[in-house]
From Swiss-Prot:
Component of the eukaryotic translation initiation factor 3 (eIF-3) complex, which is composed of 13 subunits: EIF3A, EIF3B, EIF3C, EIF3D, EIF3E, EIF3F, EIF3G, EIF3H, EIF3I, EIF3J, EIF3K, EIF3L and EIF3M. The eIF-3 complex appears to include 3 stable modules: module A is composed of EIF3A, EIF3B, EIF3G and EIF3I; module B is composed of EIF3F, EIF3H, and EIF3M; and module C is composed of EIF3C, EIF3D, EIF3E, EIF3K and EIF3L. EIF3C of module C binds EIF3B of module A and EIF3H of module B, thereby linking the three modules. EIF3J is a labile subunit that binds to the eIF-3 complex via EIF3B. Phosphorylated by TGF-beta type II receptor. This is Eukaryotic translation initiation factor 3 subunit I. It comes from Pongo abelii. GO terms for molecular function: RNA binding; translation initiation factor activity. The modification Phosphothreonine is found at residue 219. WD repeats lie at residues 8-47, 50-91, 144-183, 186-225, 283-324.
Length: 325
């Protein structure tokens, strides 16, 4: 399984994301550059230039017309995917940590950090109403008083958002009223990543408490746990098989205070039902910050602390693999 190596960032990768069809791969890092690549051969299509700080999150809408990015330069920006033109600039008081389009692509949400005396907020904008964008006035703003949101995704049918917090809590917020619909706390430390399954019925969380967990996306009922020895930064569900891939590792600054060695975190594959690890893929130098499955399930990508993105196409053996319980 020889990976395709994508070199387009000078700093560590923060998030990678495929569009719905999977022909494009968007990558963002702790530099101001947003890159888009052809996922089939790793050719760089272009960059979205405009941010002036680290970019924390990226999302593409249903038909890949628009791209949304959130950055530490205290802004969330909307781009034309094809031309790279900046369509909207939404200023915030603190860094934008998560962002996303709803199912129809007409409503965007993003969350800001709790920093410099400012509160953590989730803001909702309707792109069909230009006045909201022009006046930078969201139709709804949800304050998060306790612990800041570290990862958030839209729930099924765009009725709610599922947010993971620094404290390990999971909340489901209504996209209409802003109230908390469900609240659970299954993780003991920060939730780094949330990714939905293809049919949006379940999602996987990756946490600093060395586990990834599977939840029902409507009830937030905890289903499965995947345990590792190091903090998990990202987890993704296969669209075809009952497989989940985990990426993570020990942060360099934590290495001396713990008994684990630096790096030493390959991409790890677990069986979804049996919670058993069945494979590992080496490659990155240092930890893995983001993983994503291609929507056809035939390849996956990982972005690391080393600033590289690797696209791995699975060998035929992967598709013939039968898990014996």
């Amino acid at each position: 399984m020889k990976p395709i190596l994508l070199q387009g960032h000078e700093r560590s990768i923060t998030q990678i994301k495929y569009n719905r069809e999977g022909d494009l791969l968007f990558t963002v890092a702790k530099d101001p550059i947003v890159n888009v690549w052809y996922s089939v051969n790793g050719e760089r299509l272009g960059t979205y230039m405009g941010h002036t700080g680290a970019v924390w999150c990226v999302d593409a809408d249903w038909d890949t017309k628009h791209v949304l990015t959130g950055s530490a330069d205290n802004s969330c920006r909307l781009w034309d995917c094809e031309t790279g033109k900046q369509l909207a600039l939404l200023k915030t008081n603190s860094a934008v940590r998560t962002c996303g389009f709803d199912f129809g692509g007409s409503i965007i949400m993003f969350s800001t950090d709790k920093q410099m005396g400012y509160q953590c907020f989730v803001s909702f904008f309707d792109l069909r109403d230009p006045s909201q964008i022009d006046n930078n006035e969201p139709y709804m703003k949800i304050p998060c008083n306790d612990s800041k949101i570290t990862s958030a995704v839209w729930g099924p049918l765009g009725e709610c958002i599922i947010a993971g917090h620094e404290s390990g809590e999971l909340n489901q917020y209504s996209a209409k009223s802003g109230e908390v619909l469900v609240n659970v706390k299954e993780h003991s430390r920060q939730i780094n990543d949330i990714q939905l399954s293809r049919d949006m019925t379940m999602f996987v969380t990756a946490s600093k408490d060395n586990t990834a967990k599977l939840f029902d996306s409507t009830t937030l009922e905890h289903q499965k746990t995947f345990r590792t020895e190091r903090p998990v930064n990202s987890a993704a569900l296969s669209p075809n098989y009952d497989h989940v891939v985990l990426g993570g590792g020990q942060e360099a600054m934590d290495v001396t205070t713990t008994s684990t060695r630096i790096g030493k975190f390959e991409a790890r594959f677990f069986h979804l039902a049996f919670e058993e690890e069945f494979g590992r893929v080496k490659g990155h130098f240092g930890l893995i910050n983001s993983v994503a499955f291609h929507p056809d399930g035939k390849s996956y990508s990982s972005g690391g602390e080393d600033g590289y993105v690797r696209i791995h196409y699975f060998d035929p053996q992967y598709f013939e693999f039968e898990f014996e319980a």
